[in-house]
């Protein structure tokens, strides 16, 4: 790839054309230690070490822009796909540093972003492979390569609203080998259990495309100001997700309210109910978070509830879920009748020209028992999770180091099996990520 860089300067003598390029290197180390305190000390431990190269390119001329972001990654060491002798399961997190759908491939190259856009006074229209920043479709990945989406989009402003609509025909989901149709992308991750308690067969889901619509505006209520955001995710004939976020701040205090509602569309993806993706009629979620800043530290408490209308369902590999009770290395997707409460603190400080960001949080997730497949798709026990993380940036953000530790302990009222324990509870997970911007985005 580096050999080709000189040829990208074509056209740079034209003053109306600007071409910029950049290169970033990533090293990602990860390990999960299973069976730390409980009865299953024999469970397999996992580790993985990957390195990657990211090449960025932007070409701008008049109102046109071409944007590219190519990722290459290589698994250098580890045992992410080794089967545990007791349960037959492999790793949950470490396998995400390569391709879950192609475990035989230790090296990947994905043209994650290749986007042509045109900007006018009123709107921007784009076509190709692009990123999104929704609550469920986004590039916040925690892996080597983020999720990106292929199709077209429209962004516009008017009447105090910022709006975006995207039609998506293919998805390059994180931890997979590349772009696939929406139907194939729905089927490629952990199937979990269906509403009958059997392995969920998603291989014949009919999902021709997806539509993402997002609208947001600034709001003011007396001494409070903030942001109101509405999102709609639609997969025709399968399901629709409607989400509302309201943030209001006053002085050092911030309140964040969330509401989510899901509806089954058509037959849920297949005429055979056992092969449909969305096998329930609906689901509903409520969330609230309060944070208060003291000096340079934000203290917060958050709570959320998924009620008994059904499980919250969304392809978990399409991005991080931005629920108010989110903690790194955990999801609430696949859960119903689930209450979560998280408390924590985050802060920022500088020392010796190094900028630091860090935080600690602990949360309790009260779920239905793992055997309750109607409301617990992945047989997850109730648990307490504690996260500690620390990020450092120096030399103008050219160097970035992120460290994270996660501890999960079970809170189930019933005994849990080894299969319900491995990679889920009674475990310690560590992640270390180093990113070096070898060449900041600059003009050729």
PLM feature spans:
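Residue-level signature of outer-membrane beta-barrel architecture
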Residues: 57-61, 117-120, 155-158, 167, ...
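Residues that define the transmembrane beta-barrel architecture of outer-membrane proteins
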Residues: 17, 45-51, 108-112, 145-150, ...
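Outer membrane beta-barrel
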Residues: 57-88, 99-181
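Outer-membrane beta-barrel translocator/channel fold
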Residues: 76-78, 164-210, 218, 251-326, ...
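C-terminal structural cap/anchor segments
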Residues: 303-393
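Outer-membrane beta-barrel "beta-signal"
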Residues: 213, 424-444
């Amino acid at each position: 790839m580096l050999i080709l860089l000189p040829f990208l300067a074509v056209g740079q003598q034209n003053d109306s054309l600007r071409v910029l390029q950049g290169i970033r290197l990533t090293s990602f180390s990860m390990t999960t230690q299973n069976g730390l305190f409980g009865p299953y000390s024999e469970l397999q431990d996992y580790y993985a070490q990957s390195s990657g190269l990211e090449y960025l390119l932007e070409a701008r001329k008049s109102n046109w822009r071409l944007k590219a972001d190519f990722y290459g990654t290589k698994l250098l060491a580890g045992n992410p796909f080794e089967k545990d002798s007791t349960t037959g399961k492999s790793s949950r997190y470490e396998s995400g540093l390569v391709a879950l759908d192609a475990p035989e491939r230790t090296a990947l190259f994905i043209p994650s972003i290749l986007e042509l856009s045109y900007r006018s006074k009123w709107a921007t229209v784009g076509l190709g492979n692009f990123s999104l920043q929704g609550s469920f479709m986004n590039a916040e990945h925690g892996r080597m390569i983020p999720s990106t989406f292929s199709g077209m989009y429209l962004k516009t402003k008017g009447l105090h609203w910022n709006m975006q609509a995207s039609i998506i025909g293919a998805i390059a989901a994180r931890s997979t080998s590349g772009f696939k149709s929406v139907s194939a992308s729905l089927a490629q991750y952990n199937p979990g259990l269906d509403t009958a308690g059997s392995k969920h067969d998603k291989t014949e889901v009919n999902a021709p495309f997806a539509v993402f619509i997002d609208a947001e505006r600034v709001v003011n209520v007396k001494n409070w100001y903030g942001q109101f955001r509405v999102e709609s995710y639609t997969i025709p004939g399968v399901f629709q997700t409607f989400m509302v976020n309201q943030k209001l701040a006053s002085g050092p205090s911030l309140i964040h309210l969330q509401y989510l509602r899901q509806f089954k569309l058509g037959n849920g993806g297949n005429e055979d109910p056992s092969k449909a993706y969305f096998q329930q009629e609906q689901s509903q979620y409520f969330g609230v978070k309060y944070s208060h800043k003291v000096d340079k530290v934000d203290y917060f408490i958050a709570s959320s509830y998924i009620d008994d209308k059904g499980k919250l369902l969304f392809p978990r590999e399409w991005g991080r879920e931005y629920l108010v009770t989110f903690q790194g290395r955990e999801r609430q997707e696949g859960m119903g009748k689930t209450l979560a409460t998280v408390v924590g603190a985050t802060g920022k400080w500088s020392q010796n020209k190094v900028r630091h960001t860090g935080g600690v949080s602990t949360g309790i997730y009260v779920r239905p028992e793992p055997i309750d497949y109607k409301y617990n798709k992945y047989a997850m026990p109730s648990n307490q999770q504690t996260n500690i993380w620390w990020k450092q940036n120096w030399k103008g953000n050219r160097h970035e180091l992120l460290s994270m530790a996660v501890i999960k302990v079970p809170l189930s009222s019933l005994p849990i099996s080894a299969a319900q324990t491995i990679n889920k509870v009674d475990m310690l997970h560590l992640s270390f990520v180093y990113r070096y911007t070898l060449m900041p985005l600059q003009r050729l």
